[in-house]
Amino acid sequence: MLKDKKVIILGDRDGIPGQAIEACIKSAGAHVLFSTTECFVUTSAGAMDLENQKRIKGFAEEFGAENILIVLGGAEAEASGLACETVTNGDPTFAGPLAGVQLGLSCYHVVEPEIKNNVDADVYDEQIGMMEMVLDVDAIIAEIKGYREQFGKYVLAEAEV
């Protein structure tokens, strides 16, 4: 399902770092365009870093929004939801390059079954297993799914799940 996908990884210093997500994504044969680890709650009011917004917008223009998959690693549901809202419906703070830009990108958190069940299980356990135990996985999944269903134009096809 993830093989040959073009992936942008937004890890979280207090959640799951970009490097851990990257190891999982690469184990599934995906191509990582960009990977970073940010402090989701450190940025102004939880808004996505402006430089990251610029890079995401550039990749969507270069490769087509339908070909981009965003994978998040946020520690909290609300912060992860803000990131998902930004890449699907536009920057809710109207501060960055994605203000008013509805890319509708395919966006998932690494703990969601659509991602977790499609990467190497041993790599996932080694890189993410411990952190997953302390996250409120159900709340994160509900938050991301809500934004994805409301604003996402591109989601992983059922056949891919």
UniProtKB/Swiss-Prot annotation:
Q: Name one Pfam family in it.
A: GRDA
Question: Which EC number(s) does the record attach to this protein?
Answer: 1.21.4.2, 1.21.4.3, 1.21.4.4
| This protein's record includes keyword S-adenosyl-L-methionine | no
The GO terms describing molecular function are: betaine reductase activity; glycine reductase activity; sarcosine reductase activity
Which enzyme type, at the first EC level? oxidoreductase
* Keyword tags: Oxidoreductase, Selenocysteine
Q: Which residues are named in the active-site annotation?
A: U42
Q: Which domain of life is it from?
A: Bacteria
A GO CC annotation recorded here is: glycine reductase complex
**UniProt catalytic activity:** acetyl phosphate + [thioredoxin]-disulfide + NH4(+) + H2O = [thioredoxin]-dithiol + glycine + phosphate + H(+); acetyl phosphate + methylamine + [thioredoxin]-disulfide + H2O = sarcosine + [thioredoxin]-dithiol + phosphate + H(+); acetyl phosphate + trimethylamine + [thioredoxin]-disulfide + H2O = glycine betaine + [thioredoxin]-dithiol + phosphate + H(+)
- Relate the assembly described in the record: Monomer. Component of the glycine, sarcosine and betaine reductase complexes, together with components B and C.
| HAMAP family, per database record | GRDA
Role this protein plays: In the first step of glycine, betaine and sarcosine reductases, the substrate is bound to component PB via a Schiff base intermediate. Then the PB-activated substrate is nucleophilically attacked by the selenol anion of component PA to transform it to a carboxymethylated selenoether and the respective amine. By action of component PC, acetyl phosphate is formed, leaving component PA in its oxidized state. Finally component PA becomes reduced by the thioredoxin system to start a new catalytic cycle of reductive deamination.
The similarity annotation says: Belongs to the GrdA family.
Name of the protein: Glycine/sarcosine/betaine reductase complex component A2
This protein's gene is called grdA2
